[in-house]
Amino acid sequence: MPRARLVVETLPAIGSRCRIEGEEAAHARARRLAVGDPVVLVDGTGREAHGSVVSLTRVAVEVAVESVHAAAAEAHGPIHLLVAAVRSERLSWIAEKATELGAARLTLVASQRTQRFRASEGLAPRLERVVREAAKQAERASWPAIAGPVAFAEALRGETAGTRLILDPSGEPFPAALPAGATALLVGPEGGWTDAELQAALSAGWLTASLAAGKLRAETAAVAALTLTRAALARRP
């Protein structure tokens, strides 16, 4: 049977027993796990601990750890998705899909046309839960680090190496191939970037890239850009 995946704060050592409570224990009960069932423990660092259930109660599940190893690494290098802040439910969808598509980081950006955005107190914990659940579903051993919202200028300054692309409908066609290494994708609000923002990005060494489509919602553009980036990195020159 497929191994259930449970999230822990820190991956336990081989031969140890790990007691899991709270939401992950509830997840184990929802999966109807029983003593002897195989499980995979992940902590978001790219490693996995394989083991089996040795006890299961109403409040906790205990796992005996049999092996720990690094999960298969992404062949292309880390992808950083920076997206102009949108409504929280749409951010949750972006976070979920970014995790499934292997983004290493997700940063919310406050642009000129998203100045009214204010992150609610519960937004960061909610996005953290979303990416953890998405990683379990996609069987990934890591998930994006969440940051922001940061100012547009700060987002530009934060990326100094690798390929840096800012999406713009009037920009150059999205690259068919990209060199291996870090890639940053800057996705704007539906109203688009201002001329001043585009000029600032170009002056900072970013390249424009177009998805060759009509006007897209921010979440659609984010997923399309991630998908094209993975394909372009697979065809790296």
Question: What does each model-identified segment do?
Answer:
Residues 1-70:
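N-terminal positively charged helical leader segments and presequences
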Residues 4-5, 38, 61-62, 78-81, ...:
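Structural motif
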Residues 10-11, 22-23, 44-45, 85-86, ...:
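Fold-independent oxyanion-binding glycine-rich loops
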Residues 29, 99-102, 202:
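Non-catalytic positions within long, well-ordered alpha-helices that form the structural scaffold/packing
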Residues 72-165:
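RNA substrate-binding interface of SAM-dependent RNA methyltransferases
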Residues 159-200, 206-211:
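Active-site/ligand-binding-proximal alpha/beta "capping" segment
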Residues 195-237:
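Structured adenosyl-cofactor binding patch, chiefly the S-adenosyl-L-methionine
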